[in-house]
């Protein structure tokens, strides 16, 4: 059984009705992520993902999930494996206040995001916090520190940010569509380069 991405009741409640297309690192990037998250949680107790993930898109389409799944499956058929490379521990500043593991903009990662943007053009699927390919920061959220006071956030931000000399990397050959419904997380694994016969 796969580890869920979110587990706390408060997180599950806040995500109700939403869907996320994500990548799940499982090797080198996962290892450095877990070490960084453990270190961050040692400095403060804060909401955080239960499992590392790279979000490619967020949606709010609880009544059109099958339509959304069909579009993503079609996108995945033409998708090649994606190289993810961790390059730094960084932050999203206030008002978000999130410590992140920032990823390099590898050609395969940028292409996957851009191709998804193209697939979504002309649809009225509701996207959340969508950015252009140029403006999107590829990342894994480590902890969510939105409730920290400004001084405490400034200190955490300064202590967290650093470049990674080792540049851990791995290749991911599938995506997951994750959705939140009735207080629970659900997901479907979608391999790249394979046509589903559903």
Model feature map: region roles:
Residues 21, 101, 175-177:
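Hydrophobic beta-strand residues in large extracellular and virion-surface proteins
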Residues 89-95, 170-186, 194:
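Glycine-rich beta-strand-turn "strand-cap" elements at beta-sheet edges
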